[in-house]
């Protein structure tokens, strides 16, 4: 698996990208219409969130048919045309594969419920539940029909965990992966894939809600190698990424080193918990810069030294917009957006851009709970009230942390609904769309900066291939790192604050050249005063 490390991925939440039918929901034809825009940006791979038939209890991550298209997005002919048109623009597609669990409406589960022993072995069905908790709250077990038994669901009770110990399950799932490969797909993102390694007998695990009993178990590596061999492993141009829940560096190295033939890279989320108070999501706290820096340095250095590979990202469909979390957007939206971009695009790993990030989209700033549709947010609001928070306090927390923040319609222009739909959008457009939209921003500093970062990664092996080394570790407001390759060195300085930062430039870099900055007048000296949210990359031959 010789991963092309010059590639950059772009994530599309299909429901919110572009609606061509007026039903308020984005569709494949909307994506086809915008492929020239993606080509202008310069991305190589588009990751699509699930578009399969689904009861939509978990935004399509509860799949009832793995080899069909939910008609709300179009049909298979539309999908095939989308893949073909994208290839003409040198863009490939990466699909979301949800193989830890399927919907209880899937025919496998329905046949199991009807008493078919063959399909009952596809799931974890026990006489007694364990003490494990679901990641969505409550027990991870639900009654299996009226049999008196229970089935395992680590997520919603309509998402039944699949038993990978059963070779028939593996055979069916590998058939699914190959079905989409045959459609021309060139990448897969495997949802919570490090949870597929359950033990033969499931027992109580009081520690940490039961997570140690099913997270990063050694057998996961065996399953991934089996899948690699049976599906995408023979194609060197394939890109695979595992979403890893509550994972460790040691495991991510194993998942991603090429010689193990598992996956190309791993997603981890530790850096997006640095604004959680006491580890709790539903809180408001300033981000912990020291912790952010420590995480980036630890993961960057370890993955570099041990040959692992990471997916790098600030935003996705489950997170509020990074600009709202890390930047003073009232005063420095452009500078903050470009600094955040440089801090990962110049680092070691494959960068992922989440739709709208390239134009500096921000959270929607909704006025009331009635604007939110995400079930997690609605439940959290009630939980916060139950904990004694006032409606105002609870709403402020939802405003800051809701997953709907990133799921609002893509902002194309200043017309009604941000140019996303002529109908009523499934989720209201953010308030900022009249100012922040593609039409306004395509010639603006953020979009241009993203294009430049993508170009540099393609042209400069030190960015795509170089090692990672922490730099200026004592700085209280600058996250800095070095990249090294074949005698070349690159120093990247990122000021994470809206105030200036004095930096002593290491001697060997003082005679280097400024490769990139998000301010025009960047000059080198022994001491440099970085402006608010400035990024400065210095190259030494």
Locations of the language-model features?
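Loop/helix patches that line or flank the sugar-binding groove of alpha-linked glycan CAZymes
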Residues: 2-5, 222-224, 231-237, 254-256, ...
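Acidic/aromatic-lined carbohydrate-recognition and catalytic surfaces
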Residues: 2-178, 182, 195-248, 257-258, ...
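Beta-strand-rich binding/interaction modules
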Residues: 500-518
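Active-site rim elements
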Residues: 160-166, 170, 213-214, 322-335, ...
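C-terminal beta-strand-rich structural cap/linker in extracellular carbohydrate-active enzymes
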Residues: 525-541
């Amino acid at each position: 698996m010789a991963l092309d490390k010059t590639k950059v991925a772009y994530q599309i939440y299909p429901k919110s990208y572009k609606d061509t039918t007026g039903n308020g929901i984005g569709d494949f034809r909307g994506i086809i219409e915008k492929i020239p825009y993606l080509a202008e940006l310069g991305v190589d791979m588009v990751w699509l969130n699930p578009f399969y038939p689904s009861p939509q209890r978990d935004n399509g991550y509860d799949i009832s048919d793995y080899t069909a298209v939910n008609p709300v997005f179009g049909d298979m002919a539309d999908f095939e045309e989308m893949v073909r048109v994208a290839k003409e623009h040198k863009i490939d597609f990466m699909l979301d594969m949800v193989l830890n669990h399927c919907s209880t409406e899937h025919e496998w589960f329905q046949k199991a419920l009807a008493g078919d022993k063959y399909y009952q072995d596809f799931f974890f069905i026990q006489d007694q539940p364990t003490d494990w908790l679901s990641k969505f709250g409550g027990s991870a077990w639900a009654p299996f029909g009226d049999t008196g038994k229970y089935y395992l669901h680590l997520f919603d009770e309509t998402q039944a965990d699949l038993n990978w110990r059963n070779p028939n399950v593996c055979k069916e799932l590998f058939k699914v992966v190959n079905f989409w490969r045959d459609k021309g797909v060139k990448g897969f993102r495997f949802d919570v894939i490090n949870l597929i390694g359950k033990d033969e007998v499931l027992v109580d695990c009081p520690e940490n809600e039961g997570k140690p009993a099913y997270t990063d178990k050694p057998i996961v590596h065996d399953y991934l190698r089996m899948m690699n061999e049976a599906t995408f492993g023979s194609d060197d141009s394939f890109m695979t990424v595992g979403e890893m829940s509550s994972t460790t560096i040691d495991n991510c190295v194993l998942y991603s080193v090429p010689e193990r033939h598992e996956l190309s890279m791993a997603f981890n989320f530790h850096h997006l918990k640095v604004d959680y108070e006491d580890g709790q999501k539903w809180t408001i706290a300033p981000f912990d810069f020291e912790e952010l820096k420590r995480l980036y340095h630890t993961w960057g250095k370890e993955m570099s030294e041990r040959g692992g590979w990471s997916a790098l990202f600030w935003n996705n469909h489950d997170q509020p917009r990074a600009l709202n979390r890390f930047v003073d957007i009232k005063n420095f939206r452009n500078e903050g957006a470009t600094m955040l971009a440089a801090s990962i695009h110049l680092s070691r790993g494959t960068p992922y851009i989440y739709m709208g990030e390239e134009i500096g989209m921000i959270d929607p700033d909704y006025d009331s709970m009635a604007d939110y549709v995400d079930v997690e947010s609605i439940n959290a609001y009630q939980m916060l009230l139950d904990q004694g928070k006032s409606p105002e306090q609870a709403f402020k927390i939802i405003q800051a942390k809701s997953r709907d923040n990133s799921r609002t319609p893509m902002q194309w222009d200043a017309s009604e609904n941000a140019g996303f739909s002529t109908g009523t959008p499934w989720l209201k457009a953010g308030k900022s769309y009249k100012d922040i939209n593609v039409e306004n921003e395509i010639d603006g500093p953020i979009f241009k900066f993203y294009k430049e970062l993508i170009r540099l990664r393609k042209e400069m092996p030190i960015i795509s291939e170089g090692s990672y080394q922490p730099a200026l570790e004592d700085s209280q407001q600058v996250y800095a790192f070095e990249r090294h390759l074949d005698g070349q060195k690159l120093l990247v300085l990122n000021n994470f604050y809206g105030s200036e930062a004095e930096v002593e430039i290491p001697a060997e870099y003082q005679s280097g050249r400024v490769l990139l900055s998000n301010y025009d007048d960047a000059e080198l000296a022994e001491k440099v005063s970085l402006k608010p949210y400035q990024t400065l990359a210095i190259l030494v031959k």
